[in-house]
Amino acid sequence: MNRLLIDIVCVSFLLFFSCKEENLLQPYGGNENSIPTPVSNVQVKNIPGGAVLYYDLPKDPDLLSVKAIYTATNGSQQTVSASAYVDSLKIVGLGNTNDYKVTLFTVNHMEKISSPVEVTITPQVPPVQRVFESLDYSVDFGGFVVSYDNDTESEVAIYILRQDSTGNEMEYYDALYTKSKQGNYPVRGLPNKENQFGIYVRDRYENTSDTILFTETPMREDLLDKSLFTSMKVAGDVGWNFYSGDPTYAWDDKVSNTNYAHTDFPVEFPHRFTMDLGVTVKLSRFRFWQRPGDEVIYQHGAPKHYKVYGRAEKPEAGSASDPFAGWTLLMECHSVKPSNLPLGQFSSEDVEFISKGEEFSFPRDIPNVRYLRFEMQESWSGMKCSTIGELAFWGEIQ
């Protein structure tokens, strides 16, 4: 019995060490010497900043992919691959409308490549240039507003330059990173004095536009002193003292989950409150911070839609049946959630967005005001309450 067991063990060892070890990382295929057939009938569809190449695939069961090689605008060699299950590939990121030579190869599972097929593409006007040609600006409070169109919805950066203190160099001041189809970007924080500015566009492929240079004087803009703010009670206003909340917490320079204004609960919408800014001002913009916290941002009582009214004279007691007699509607505000994720879900971009405060610019033609009245019309969750983390206002004090 012992002899039989020893024989079995010996045979097992011999079989184990006689097995050839297979390297699963090596290329594999039907014939290691075969060269794949190239693509045929290549058709070119030029697009902004690139092209889509359509082709007929060879009838080769060992085909792995199609590879395109070309030299990008910045001189670097680029490679784009498409699987054997699709009959096209896309080239993007070219920065002009020059002709570009593209070389196509097929690749099999043994990583053998076919003979080359060369085609020429002529990209349409690239996104970086299309955005640049659409740029416009208008002088505004504390700076200017840059408008742009981005019809291809490409990822671009719009850079803002200003002349430095020596007057000899242009320096970086601000940038907008976007893939929105169009937009207006306010450039803020600039002094009320003449200076030279520049705007240019760049994309993720290092393509850069020319620079628009202009000389302007931004309008004066003051950050309003929150120590002058006071709350008021006008007919039709709701209480803002629920769960240790207080209306003055909305302008105490503290943004926390334990320091916020909270309406009584539950109270049917709309929810109104009135405040005195302490000065008469031509408002330019304001910033609204939601109550922070994972369980409340873009939910609970975070306002989704609301209106802002103003007036210069101190309001009388008013009437609940006519709550806005003597008030001017300054703007309607619609809170934005960048990710558009469902209720209770949010992205890091959402958190970053609201942590900076959601900013709203007042129309240029609004009257001078001292008193403001907010009317909350809907919360993000539908709950019958409203909360405010913090408010800040800018404008030209009269």
List each model region and its residues:
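Recognizes extended acidic, P/S/T-rich segments that occur
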Residues: L57, P61-T97, S115, L161-N192, ...
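Preference for solvent-exposed, low-hydrophobicity sequence contexts
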Residues: R162-Y185, Q196, Y200-N241
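Pro/Thr/Ser/Gly-rich low-complexity, intrinsically disordered linker/stalk tracts
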Residues: K20-P61, N96, I113-E153, D210-K233, ...
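C-terminal motif of bacterial Sec signal peptides marking the signal peptidase cleavage site
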Residues: L15-S18
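Surface-exposed loops/turns
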Residues: I47, N96-T97, P191-N192, V279, ...
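Beta-strand-rich modules
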Residues: L64, L89-V117, G183-P218
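Disordered, acidic Ser/Thr/Pro-rich linker "stalks" and the adjacent N-terminal cap
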Residues: L213-G278, R291-D294, Y298, G344-E352
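Aromatic, loop-rich ligand-recognition surfaces of beta-strand-rich domains
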Residues: K254-F324, K356-Q398
